[in-house]
Amino acid sequence: MKANAFGKVAVMLGGTSAERDVSLKSGMAVLKGLVAKGIDAHAFDPAAHSLQELVEQKFDRVFIALHGRGGEDGSMQGALQILEMPYTGSDVLGCALGMDKVRCKQIWHSVGLPTANWRVVTQAEIEQVNVEAMLQELGGRVIVKPAREGSSIGMSIADNGRSLALALQHAAEFDDDLLVEQWVEGAEYTIGILEGKALPVIRLQTPHEFYDFEAKYQANDTQYHCPAGLSDDDEASLRTLAERAFAAIGGSGWGRIDVMRNNAGEWFLLEANTVPGMTEKSLVPMAAKVAGLQFNDLVERILAQTLER
């Protein structure tokens, strides 16, 4: 595909969410890749520029590299649709559902896809929660998550009443709705999605209790295994599960699905990511490379999806 077919491209990065720093790194990597392909691409931080400038400066399309609220939750996608500006990734509905961990799990559960047991606590309900009863109901060990944050921000593990109360208070600093999810003991996997098809599975190995913010972006002791060491049948079934999970929430274009496998060999869907990280430590580029797709070609493929909008 000729580079001039894309016209003038805005790489949207930064923003105002708690994931701003990660977004800046993702966006700059994407920008570098697009420019290397000869594409007329420019950085655009919506925290510093009005969206009207996209029209005034005659941009033709947008590569969204915003993570978290305001960029991955459907609001930016809706604004760009009003401007009739083609953009990468899922639409308003897919992004909104993917960002909301509670709604995402409700949909997966409703269509028969496997996900760990959970309960929802609102910020207003924290003081009334019977933490001991909730722990017992969910198997004695849980992970608490803000419903609408990414990069593992605000997450913590609890295995007694005091730690659950503290975990709820911590998560409430980031969201009014909190997900209390049964802890799944086992290995964590992630599956990139590109054009509706799963990329090679990656198995994550970290000495941390879980794949938290530090393990994702700061630690040097996190190991990534791709190929993941699964049998051919397990690799195929996990890829199919990821494709179904992404489609169930209305995801499109590209994304990532995170999964746990318990010690009995059962799969449990964790989360959907509709604008995954694109930093030097990010997982979708890693899987794409194993599939034979170099980073610059990957970002061009993702951008090419906007030509169909």
From Swiss-Prot:
Keywords: ATP-binding, Cell shape, Cell wall biogenesis/degradation, Cytoplasm, Ligase, Magnesium, Manganese, Metal-binding, Nucleotide-binding, Peptidoglycan synthesis. It is found in: Cytoplasm. Mg(2+) 2 binds at E271, N273. One of its GO terms (biological process) is regulation of cell shape. ATP binds at residues 135-190. One of its GO terms (cellular component) is cytosol. Mg(2+) 1 binds at D258, E271. Its EC number is 6.3.2.4. It holds the Pfam family Dala_Dala_lig_C. Its cofactor is Mg(2+); Mn(2+). It catalyses: 2 D-alanine + ATP = D-alanyl-D-alanine + ADP + phosphate + H(+). Binds 2 magnesium or manganese ions per subunit. Cell wall formation. GO terms for molecular function: ATP binding; D-alanine-D-alanine ligase activity; metal ion binding. The keyword Cell wall biogenesis/degradation applies. Pathway: Cell wall biogenesis; peptidoglycan biosynthesis. InterPro entries: ATP-grasp (IPR011761), ATP_grasp_subdomain_1 (IPR013815), D-Ala_lig_Van_CS (IPR000291), D_ala_D_ala (IPR005905), Dala_Dala_lig_C (IPR011095), Dala_Dala_lig_N (IPR011127), PreATP-grasp_dom_sf (IPR016185). Residues 105-304 form the ATP-grasp domain. This is D-alanine--D-alanine ligase. Belongs to the D-alanine--D-alanine ligase family.
